[in-house]
């Protein structure tokens, strides 16, 4: 990455605290940001990209309503409903309600939207929000540990018309690297009735595991055929078998990059779910973090250094918190052009501060 690139890192004490209340990822945000802080990645230093830590704003009701239904928002933003089971809105089982949910939703959505705003206002070339990346939330329903559709909101924000003497509509590519299919994002932008040969402002590409009985069940998670009535060339999936490794990603990556070059996005959103990494409790893939060809670090570095446009890195899945912390700290180090030995660092902190 060129040294002149600017990196915006979106976080606050309140955001990390509330994100650490997630039933599926308790204390994860605090552990992630403790490690990044301990590595000194927030500190300015010669020879690295400029990084600015930015306190996120809370998303307004209007922000959230660009995608979510009024019924869902009225319920989930009411503090009296925190911790209450409600199957109508998916608040049960793997998306159980919790105390603090009514604050979590606007804080996480606001953080991701703040990241988008730094990119749109040319304040940054790369924006990072590890508490974002919630790709299973539907318009009126929580699902799969996700309660707010910040990924969808980010796409809608970035694709807005850019005013000026020659107004233009930015092109936004969403690349999902989570173990699980980006069902809610893909379904939100899936347009099978698109006229043949027409273009789109958005392109969704999800690389994931898909098999019978594996969450989420979606007809869009498999390979599609152009003869399929539901085919949309701008909503793509690459399903991988159990055991996918660096070699697997290395083989498919030229396809991913060909898609990116052809689409030529102004903005690329990368959902960096860490549950596809070896060591995650799902134990489905055998993907590594390091810099070798096909590894997660290698893929992200390729995006940051050779893909067109600006980039937004979001979090996502990952249920071994130290594993996730190492992954996202390492990806942060790539964004700011710092070489760091994560394998030598212990993970003992459970709190952090910005100094």
Language-model features, listed with the residues they occupy:
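Charged, often glycine-rich, active-site loop that binds/positions anionic groups
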Residues: 56-84
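A general "terminal functional-core" signal
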Residues: 2-5, 9-10, 16, 75-355
